[in-house]
Regions:
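Catalytic core of non-heme Fe(II) oxygenases with the double-stranded beta-helix
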Residues: 463-473, 477-576, 581-610
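Non-heme Fe(II)/2-oxoglutarate
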Residues: 400-495, 516
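Position-specific recognition of the canonical hydrophobic site in helix A of tetratricopeptide repeat
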Residues: 17, 51, 78, 85, ...
Length: 610
């Protein structure tokens, strides 16, 4: 068979590429393109050579030329999308993957790549239907099932995620990704011991990956095994020194273990070695703000290069720091830069509204928050700050949003199996004390002068905790039934009472004398509650010492927001309220401790099992 000159050159180029001789491969391919500029295979090979040389810009140029000549090549669109993804152009990558699927809806590679990309970009809600559609063509695609499970985890559909991971493991029992995903779903379902078993099995099978070590740290932390969690996060950073969440979790764990002098050293070691990724720097600066280290914050800030601080995420942090110092013009400049992206995180919009409130601009804050709520109607932070803005404006909608009858008090009484309330609380305190393994409060939390348990405290299969859980479940059902039966408008269009629900978080707090909670909200829930196990005695000098109060935010505003409601901490009493209500506690001085169990509830996403 007689080959043309371009064909011979391409064959020589391909042989050189296989041998790793990139310079020769590139030269022969360029000669082929000079001889035949519209030869599709030459552009395809040139792209492969560029990818091997880690030159994605050149690869994209040749892939676009190849696709102009062969627009129905799904593999070409997949390669182009992958190249865009590697070079940090997610929108272009998404368009390429979608074009590939237009050519062939059943192409598994393009669909998996698109689902993975959307999940990575924080668009799991959009990734889920794309994955589900693909499973209609390939129901045994373990990779797609795993990706679907990972996207479902982000939406807290833990039961559905577990079902998908189990299905993936039926088709590919050795899939480490599906096994680890299964562990994360179990953790989300408050089955920490089962999650730990799954992760340990992967460890014993020889898997060494930073994500495994990081997830082990998270589960061990949930279980209150903080020293072991610390070691796991250290191992995660040894395997991947660039993974920001491991730095944050390690710092948080060391702080809880009482190391408030050196808890941020891992960040500083990373910076000294030249690791200056924006998420890492933001986490460090945010931690300094959280613990009130303003001088250290300014020193650290001045040590980072200007081009790094120009990143939107860091502009958000600088805006918050300026607002806290009362430097509002500077804060607004930083906010504008942080919010310059087409769709910035809603949390940053909330920070900007917070600055507007601090600066005495509730009208601007309300307008911003109402726009943001159109993107996420159930966002608890947005509702909380909107309630403040409406209150300051005298807007009657504030009274509806903060209606007093939304705070519900129930005295639960003695659960079965216990003779008296005192006997129940004595047993409950003993079980809870075993879980208070931290030496001080988490630095990013709102309690001061006490400790907080890790993970979901209501998961514990212990007699008193189990009895309390049954009481709380009945109380929540009764409360939701009451809310559903009420006529009239809802407090807000976002305020809908769920059908199936779950505990999205539950923890115990043990405050010491002079301890208290700053004013805060619970953004992870729909309704929240606190059950009083132990309360300080009445103080003649301060009749409301240790009381729960609702109303003002944790902001020093030009106009004071009054306290709207107060509740006494009576052992055996449960107080339920919307999670977006600003609430906190007054400090107390008498007695030994103030012990509570608090929780949030959220809608429960049931599995489809299709």
């Amino acid at each position: 068979m007689v080959r043309s000159r371009p064909e011979r050159l391409l064959m020589e180029s391909q042989q050189a590429l296989q041998k790793g001789e990139l310079a020769l491969a590139r030269r022969r391919c360029e000669e082929a393109l000079e001889a035949a500029p519209k030869l599709a295979l030459a552009h395809q090979l040139a792209a492969a050579i560029a990818i091997k040389a880690q030159d994605d810009s050149q690869a994209q140029q040749h892939l676009r030329a190849f696709l102009d000549l062969q627009p129905d090549s799904v593999e070409g669109w997949l390669s182009l999308g992958n190249s865009y993804r590697r070079s940090g152009a997610p929108r272009d990558a998404e368009l390429a993957y979608r074009q590939g699927l237009r050519v062939d809806l059943q192409h598994g590679g393009c669909r998996r790549a698109l689902v993975r990309l959307l999940h990575e970009q924080g668009h799991s809600v959009h990734a889920i239907p794309i994955a589900e559609a693909g499973l209609r063509y390939a129901p045994q695609d373990a990779g797609l099932l795993t990706l679907l499970g990972e996207a479902l985890l982000e939406t807290e559909a833990f039961e559905e995620a577990l079902y998908r991971f189990d299905n993936a493991l039926r088709h590919r029992p050795d899939s480490a990704a599906a096994r680890q995903g299964r562990a994360l779903a179990l953790r989300g379902l408050d089955r920490q011991e089962d999650a730990l078993s799954e992760l340990r099995a992967l460890e014993q099978a020889g898997l060494q990956h930073f994500s495994l070590a990081h997830n082990l740290g998270n589960v061990l932390s949930d279980l209150g095994r903080l020293e072991e969690a610390e070691a796991a996060y250290v191992q995660a950073l040894a395997l991947n020194p660039d993974y920001g969440p491991s730095y944050s979790n390690l710092a948080r764990t060391r702080w809880c273990l009482g190391d408030d002098a050196h808890f941020l050293e891992p960040f500083e070691t990373a910076f000294a070695s030249g690791r200056l990724a924006p998420p890492l720097v933001k986490a460090y600066l945010d931690a300094l703000l959280a613990v009130g280290e303003r001088a250290r914050f300014e020193k650290a800030r001045n040590g980072f290069p200007d081009n790094l601080l120009a990143e939107p995420a860091l502009q958000d942090t600088l805006a918050r720091a300026a607002a806290a110092a009362g430097e509002f013009p500077t804060a607004f400049q930083h906010h504008r830069k942080a919010l310059s992206d087409a769709e910035p995180p809603l949390q940053w919009e909330c920070h900007a509204a917070q600055t507007e409130l601090l600066a005495g601009q509730p009208g601007q804050a309300a307008a911003r928050l109402e726009r943001a709520l159109a993107r996420d109607p159930g966002n608890g932070f947005l509702l909380a700050y909107l309630a403040v803005a409406w209150t300051l404006l005298g807007d009657p909608r504030a009274e509806t949003l903060l209606a007093k009858d939304l705070v519900i008090t129930k005295d639960l009484g003695v659960p079965p199996g216990f003779e008296t309330l005192d006997a129940f609380h004595a047993a409950l305190k003993m079980e809870l004390e075993e879980e208070h393994t931290a030496r001080q409060h988490p630095f990013e939390q709102t309690l001061r002068g006490g400790t907080q348990t890790q993970g979901n405290i209501l998961r514990l299969p212990r007699p008193a905790v189990s009895a309390l859980r049954h009481q709380l479940e009945r109380a929540v059902e009764d409360t939701l039934a009451t809310l559903r039966s009420r006529s009239g408008p809802a407090p807000h269009p976002a305020f809908t009472v769920p059908g199936a629900w779950r505990f999205s978080g539950a923890w115990s707090v043990r405050l010491k004398p002079k301890g208290f909670h700053t004013m805060h909200v619970h953004p992870m829930g729909f309704y929240s509650a606190v059950y009083y196990v132990e309360a300080p005695p009445e103080d003649p000098q301060d009749p409301q010492a240790g009381w729960l109060q609702f109303g003002p935010p944790d902001l020093t505003l030009p106009t004071t927001v009054p306290v709207r409601e107060t509740r006494a901490p009576v052992p055996g009493r449960l107080v339920l309220f919307p999670s977006y209500f600003w609430h906190g506690t007054r400090p107390f001085t008498l007695g030994s401790h103030r012990t509570t169990v608090a929780f949030d509830i959220a809608p429960r996403v049931l599995p489809k099992n299709d």
